[in-house]
Every structure is written in structure tokens, then in C-alpha cells.
Amino acid sequence: VAVGNNVLDTLGRSRQSFGGKVRQAMNVPKGKGSRGVVKAMFERFTEKAIKVIMLAQEEARRLGHNFVGTEQILLGLIGEGTGIAAKVLKSMGINLKDARVEVEKIIGRGSGFVAVEIPFTPRAKRVLELSLEEARQLGHNYIGSEHLLLGLLREGEGVAARVLENLGADPSNIRTQVIRMVGENNEVTANVGGGSGTNKMPTLEEYGTNLTKLAEEGKLDPVVGRHPQIERVVQILGRRTKNNPCLIGEPGVGKTAIAEGLAQRIASGVVRETSEGKKVITLDMGLLAAGTKYRGEFEERVKKLMEEIKQSDEIILFIDEVHTLIGAGAAEGAIDAANILKPALARGELQCIGATTLDEYRKHIEKDPALERRFQPVKVPEPTVDETIQILKGLRERYEIHHKLRYTDESLVAAAQLSYQYISDRFLPDRAIDLMDEAGSRVRLRHAQVPEEARELEKELRQITKENEAVRGQDFEKAGTLRDREIELRAEVSAIQAKGKEMSKAESETGDEGPMVTESDIQHIVSSWTGILVEKVSTDESDLLLKMEETLHKRVIGQDEAVKAISRAIRRARVGLKNPNRPIASFIFFGPTGVGKSELAKALAAYYFGCEEAMIRLDMSEFMERHTVSKLIGSPPGYVGYTEPPQLTEAVRRRPYTVVLFDEIEKAHPDVFNMMLQILEDGRLTNSKGRTVDFKNTLLIMTSNVGSSVIEKGGRRIGFDLDYEKDSSYNRIKSLVTQELKQYFRPEFLNRLDEMILFRQLTKLEVKEIADILLQELFERLKKKEVELQVTERFKERVVDEGYNPSYGARPLRRAIMRLLEDSMEEKMLAREIKEGDSVIVDVDSEGKVTVLNGGSGTPTTSLEEQEDSLPVA
């Protein structure tokens, strides 16, 4: 038993340590000359053969011998017990006990002192070498216990031969039995694999997968469409020379599926006679190269592979990612797989289908014209949306079986259409299949959830189990009560779960075929992937969209034209009426400073996209020099910053549904506008790495102060004239400013914008409304410090008088509030005259000075309640 345990422990170690032990035991130096021999000794040993050698060493230790001879190997073969060798010896009536007795009779026991590493005798080394030869003769690329026994018998001399003779075994009979059992084993594995008789293609079976066999067993997904490509592949395969098609297409368009489609056609017999009876075998290049540590080993594998294919004449080799052939196995002057295969590929000895992407084909295969001419390119285009829908319908059944649910026709159409429209950096049908798969997973998880009541009971059950374990050793009465409650809870949980199962069973019996994946599930997955709202407009959201102007006006005072234009654009996009190949909308806001151009963009981002951070803001004053354009799309290769992410394209890739604000657009270098032409017209831009970024779901807003001087000169009367005069003055100024814009920006840039919106100068009444908003923000900040602030109407008038300047908009108002109110407040707060919990009133005295009073020491002219009624909520 001790021997067995030691062996099982040792078996857990790596083959490398075993190889080292064998090398040491055989006293073979680790130089170059010995590598091939030593590799042959231990690299190909099966687990059972390793176990035999370990057992042989244990037997040597048990007998106290300082060597492993043929007799110890024989004892190891018998002791292993499960291999072919052990079974044959057992059938001959040879057991471990008798064999040990015979060995002890012949060589006796040793001195008792045994070295850690026990060496092999020259005869034992000879047995190992002969076992390798026996394996080669049988066409095996491994050494098992049966090969060790054959090597032992072939040696014919030594203690082991005498032991077998003494036990009455006939070596030739043993050899016959071993070869017969090896043949039977091969027949069984060959029949299971679908071959006939012995294993004629061990290398192909080891490094390849038979797609035709998988197709016969129905394990491949159905291939829908792609008839022209499959026909062209069959046509090329039927050529006399250079009969090697190479499938070239973008990732995810279905190149591997074409090879699977060919395998399915061959399996079903629907194929031309030139390809009838063929086998499509896909080669695993990683597995082929794995473990080839020694020079020439990789080449040897490839040559064996080619020989097997030539002999068979019915193999079509499929190499996915065919560019991996180039450089595979090439180390220190060794030739790579591509160069080994070239002669066979040109002469038509090898039928090979390759598959690779356009980029990899250009990067690797086109650089080697000798390899390129041997492959006939077959372009695999991306399927259209209609073709993708047909593909999804073909795959529907497989996914329904996997997820245990049903897909509606609408959900499949939505998966194809929405993936085409919104997931721009991937290709059909891959992105549509992924949508369909994840939607199925989501629906299944939603229906598999435990009922809420059962979850609560399970939570209580865990708590009681924990308490029960804590009190079990001390308070038996409490432990008993807890145990009873635990049993009750378990029964309740089981009852709820059983009820759920009965309900689902009843549903299936009444014809309800389980959960359904609908269009809304697909829409939800698209939203979670991209952040784009594609669900149908709900009732709540339609109210939100209809009241958009009203909500935006709470933050942006005046500027009706701009607010209406933005609201119209958002409604068009959400209802689905916008052009799908252009951005949601593109505006340029121009007008005097401080009238709400940037504020409107921020308000829109906060209101509709959730938060102000949802906006991508680019301050164009940072792009005043020509070379700074590279910040937007990335530096070209070879320049500093090539590895850094571009500011614009990367931000839009991360968040494709957003507002992009180009602030102070006229400050940028004119070359920046050239880059923006494609964004405005086609909704796309290519970054420095060649990746196309989609701007079709962005709202582009540019702000500019061009024409401020014209507005200031011609617009002094805006806000003070009668209504009809107001409009005529506004239109007159707009035409003047548009003329100035045309002088500054190129016509092709202005022509691509949806609308150019002039912001009006603010009137005094509008400035007063803005003052209410700014004061309300200050009240909110002070509330967090538990200070209640009120201002009188007189103070408010003073702030508006000081803060109103038609040329500068609302910004002077902020400075006036800072100077008149915030400065007075901070002095009082630092002097501890105003503390937490105080109610403060700010007024203006008869001399025009600002006074700050605590609630008890003065009476405000406007109470807080009255004030809040008159203030819009921020």
C-alpha cells in the first residue's frame, strides 16, 4: 500500500521533473548530442508508462537495491494493474507476489542504503530504447506500458527473462497477446471515430477536428445563405493545381461558417462529385506548435501531417487564421510552416482552405507573394440586414433549445436592424447573433429568479442556522427551538418552489411555451451596450419630450428660437424621423457673450441625457495651433502621443449618445473645420489608427462670439422696442451677423449645419429672472450649512442694477452677487456672527449699503415664503 501511495503522489508531478529523473537515472549528460535520445525516452511516455517506471524505482528501494534493472521494470508492469501489459501478464497467471519471490530468489536483497536517484542498468536502458522502437513499428507516437513489455521481451536476456521462464510464461505467447490487445484497442477507437480498421491518421486526429463528422452528428450550427461563396470554394478545390481557397473578410462575417457549410454539404451528400466523400478537418495551429521544444520537432510534425494527407487523398484541410502559418515554428534558422507547405500547396498535393481577416491578409500574406499566389482569395462580404434576418431565423432553434425559451419574429428583425444602426464597430451577422444570445440569457435569468417571499425565508433560514450553530453546545432548549423553526422554514421554501414548478408546468400544458424574447428585450440590450435610448417612447417620456421647452426655460431665460430648435431636433431623433446617416442635429449658436449659449448645451445634457457630465465639451481655444488637430483624432504613427487616446473620437466611442459641445469655435485653427466636414455630413470620422467612429447619435453644438460687435451696435434697442420692431431688428441683426460668419467660416462648413441660431441680448426683466435663479442656487448652498437666507426686494433691485450690462450678458450679475452678498456673508460667518441654525436677512439701507441681519434683529421686506413663490426652482 505504501508503494502505491508513493507512486500516486509522485504521479502528480510534472513530466519535466520525471524527464529529469530518467535522465539522471540513465546517467545521460544534458548536452546537445543526447537530446534526441533522452527526448525519445520520456517525452512520449503515457501516464501508465510513467507509473510503471515510478513503481520500478519503488520496488528497487523496497529490495534495497541501488539500481533499476529489467526485473524491477517487470515488477512495475505487473504492479501498475490497469494497462494492457498488466492485463496480459495477469491472463498468463503471473501475479506480483510470485514475481517478487522469484526476483528475491535470483538477486536477493540489497544492503538497505538506497540513493535518492536510483540509476538504470545498461540492460534497463536498452529495454527503454527498444520500447521506443516497438512503438514506432506499431505506428504509435507515444510509449505505453504495452511498449515497455514488448521491449522487455525483445531484450530476451536479464533477470526479467529468467523470472518469466521460472513462472512458466512463454515470451512469444505474451508478445502475441499484447499485439492482439493493442489491435483490438485501436479497432475500438477507430470505430468510435468513424474510421475503418486501424488508426491510419494519428497526427491529423491529434492536431485536428473532423468538421464532417461533427456535421453528421448535427453538432454544427446551420449555415444560411452564402451559396456563391461555398460554390466558389468547391470550384477552387476542384482545380488540378493551386487548389487552395482563402476566405477573406472582416471579423464576424462568417468565414468559419463557410467551411462548416461545406462540411454539412459533404455530410448530407449535396455536393459535386469532385468533393464527394471528402473530410473537412480543421487544424489547430496552437496545438501543432505546442510542446515543440527541440529543433526539428515542429518540422517533423508538419511533414507527418502532410504525408498522412497525401496518402488519404480525401482530406480537405481547413486552417482558421491562416496567417499564423507564417513564422510558426521558425526559430534560429529553422523554416516556418508556410515554407514547408508551399511546394505541396502549389502542386495540388494538399487541398487547404484558409481563413483570415483583410488586415491580417494584407499584413502577412500579401508580403509573401510566393505564398499569396498559392491561395485563391474568396471575398466574404458582410451580409445585408435582410440576409442577417434569415441567418437569425436559421439559428433560432439552436438558441431556443439552449436558453429554453422562444424568440418572436419581431425580436429577430430588431436584432438585425438595431445592431446595424447602433453597433457600428462590429460586423453583421456577428453583432446581431450576440444581441439575440444575450437577450435570451437576460429573459431566462429574469424568469429563473426565486420568488421574493422564498428569498426572504431563505435569508431567515441562513440566520437561524448560524444562531443554531452558535448555541448548540450551551443552550439545548434554545437550540431545539431554532431547529424546529429551521425545519418549518425549509418546508415553506420547498412548498413555494414546488408551487412555482407546478405553475410553469401548467403554463406549458396550456400551450404557453415558456418565456418569450420580444423586441423590447433586444432594445434593452442595445441600450445597455451603447447607452443609446432605443426603446419605444413611453407615455412618461412623450410627456417629457412635449414639455421640453418649458423645462429648459427654467435654466435658460429667453432665447426662444434656440430652445425650440434643440427641442425639435431631440423629438425628431426619439420618434425615429431623423436621417439615420447623419448626426441628430448640428447647430452653431452665435451672439454676445454671457447670454446662455454654453448654458443651453449644459441644460440639455442634464435634462435629457441624465447629467451635465454626459456632455463632451471641447474648448476650442486649446486648438489654436495647426498641430493640435492631432489631439482630436490622435497623433499619426511615429509621432509623440500615438499611443494616447484621441480626445474627440475616443470620447464618442465610449459614449455614442451624447451632446458634443465645441465651445468658442472661432478660436480654433481653420484646419479643425476641415476635419469637421465629415462629421457634419456623414456622421463619421476616422481616427489615426484607421478606426471609424460613428457620430450618428450625437447632437453637435458649436458656440461662437463672431458678430458680437455688430449685435452691440445694431441691437441696443432690442428689448425696448415694440414687438414688431423687436422682430424686424432681430432679423436685421441676424442677416448682418450671418454675413460676418460667411467671411470667417468657409461656405462648405456653414452649408452642412442644420441651423445657425442668433442669441438675443438680455433685457433687464430677463436679467432679473436670472438673478432669481442665481440667488436660489446660493440659498441651496447655504441650506447645506444649515443657514437660512432671505433677501429683500430692494436688495434684488440693487443686484440687478449693478449686474445689468447688455454687452456682457448675465456674467456681471454673478460678479454683483459675489461682491454684494457673498463677501458680506463670508465676513459675518468667519466672525461667528452667523452660525448654524440662524435665519439671515439681507437688505439695503437708505444710504444704499448692504446690511446683513440675523432673523431676530430686523424685519425683512420680503418674507422667504413670498420670495420662493416668485422664484423659479433651479
UniProtKB/Swiss-Prot annotation:
The UVR domain, residue ranges: 458-492
Family annotation (InterPro entries): AAA+_ATPase (IPR003593), ATPase_AAA_core (IPR003959), Clp_ATPase_C (IPR019489), Clp_N_dom_sf (IPR036628), Clp_R_dom (IPR004176), ClpA/B (IPR001270), ClpA/B_CS1 (IPR018368), ClpA/B_CS2 (IPR028299)
Region described as I: 204-451
UniProt region (Repeat 1), positions on chain: 45-110
Keyword vocabulary terms for this entry: ATP-binding, Chaperone, Chloroplast, Nucleotide-binding, Plastid, Repeat, Transit peptide
Region ranges (Disordered): 852-874
Localization annotation: Plastid, Chloroplast
Gene Ontology MF terms: ATP binding; ATP hydrolysis activity
Region (II): 517-708
Binding site for ATP: 249-256, 591-598
One Pfam short name: AAA_lid_9
Region (Repeat 2): 120-184
Domain Clp R: 42-184
The keyword Ribosomal protein is assigned to this record: no
Acidic residues bias: start-end ranges: 865-874
PROSITE patterns, A to Z: CLP_R, CLPAB_1, CLPAB_2, UVR
Similarity comment: family membership: Belongs to the ClpA/ClpB family.
Protein's job: May interact with a ClpP-like protease involved in degradation of denatured proteins in the chloroplast.
Protein name as annotated: ATP-dependent Clp protease ATP-binding subunit ClpA homolog, chloroplastic
